[in-house]
């Protein structure tokens, strides 16, 4: 199998990001964004996906974490899409239900080339998690789905602790990505012959 890997760099007035990704890795992850909770969530995602991931971001966290989180999601998504290449042979669809103590999240996705996000249950999240607005994480998932060109459904089913809910979501996303990216056939899984 061809090595499925990509490197992405992106520099704006808000963030400077350097990222390398190997889809079929060993779960070796190093994330440094200047925002500890983001590092924690992206490390979980990479580990549960089985990615080898190195991501560094120098962002305007003196404002807040918004640009850092959003741009990290976009770059990670772009790297994932690039690494998969023509997507021939992948399972394409993946899902996972992951508990974290009292919290449970379901993640379903399709590597369809048609980016879309459905993010349900975020009313369960407290207004602030790790010092930032809870809706920041919707922006991460939206940016990731757009960059990766995937249809992504995340349902926070129940739970009381915002950290636990998000942790179950990131673990679930990693596991669903691992399943969807798995090589299972030779041909493209599409009756129309294209994933665009």
From Swiss-Prot:
GO terms for biological process: L-histidine biosynthetic process. The keyword tRNA processing does not apply. Its main location: cytoplasm. One of its GO terms (molecular function) is imidazoleglycerol-phosphate dehydratase activity. Disulfide bonds: none annotated. Keywords: Amino-acid biosynthesis, Cytoplasm, Histidine biosynthesis, Lyase. It comes from the Bacteria. InterPro entries: IGPD_sf (IPR038494), ImidazoleglycerolP_deHydtase (IPR000807), ImidazoleglycerP_deHydtase_CS (IPR020565), Ribosomal_Su5_D2-typ_SF (IPR020568). Pfam families: IGPD (PF00475). Pathway: Amino-acid biosynthesis; L-histidine biosynthesis; L-histidine from 5-phospho-alpha-D-ribose 1-diphosphate: step 6/9. It is found in: Cytoplasm. SUPFAM superfamilies: Ribosomal protein S5 domain 2-like. It catalyses: D-erythro-1-(imidazol-4-yl)glycerol 3-phosphate = 3-(imidazol-4-yl)-2-oxopropyl phosphate + H2O. Its EC number is 4.2.1.19. CDD domains: IGPD (cd07914). One of its GO terms (cellular component) is cytoplasm. Belongs to the imidazoleglycerol-phosphate dehydratase family. This is Imidazoleglycerol-phosphate dehydratase. It comes from Oleidesulfovibrio alaskensis (strain ATCC BAA-1058 / DSM 17464 / G20) (Desulfovibrio alaskensis). The gene is hisB.
């Amino acid at each position: 199998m061809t090595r499925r890997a990509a490197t992405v760099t992106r520099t704006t007035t808000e963030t400077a990001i350097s990222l390398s990704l190997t889809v079929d890795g060993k779960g070796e992850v190093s994330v440094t964004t200047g925002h500890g909770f983001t590092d924690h969530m992206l490390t979980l995602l990479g580990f549960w996906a089985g990615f080898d991931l190195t991501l560094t971001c120098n962002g305007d966290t003196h404002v807040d974490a918004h640009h850092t989180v959003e741009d990290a999601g976009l770059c990670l998504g772009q790297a994932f899409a690039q690494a998969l290449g023509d997507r021939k042979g992948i399972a394409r669809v993946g899902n996972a239900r992951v508990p974290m103590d009292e919290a449970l999240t379901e993640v379903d996705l399709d590597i369809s080339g048609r980016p879309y996000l459905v993010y349900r249950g975020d009313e369960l999240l407290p207004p602030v998690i790790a010092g930032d607005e809870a809706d920041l994480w919707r922006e991460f998932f939206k940016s990731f789905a757009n960059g990766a060109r995937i249809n992504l459904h995340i349902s926070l089913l129940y739970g009381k602790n915002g950290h636990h809910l998000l942790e179950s979501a990131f673990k679930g996303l990693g596991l669903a990505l691992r399943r969807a990216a798995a090589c299972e056939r030779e041909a493209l899984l599409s009756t129309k012959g294209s994933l665009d």
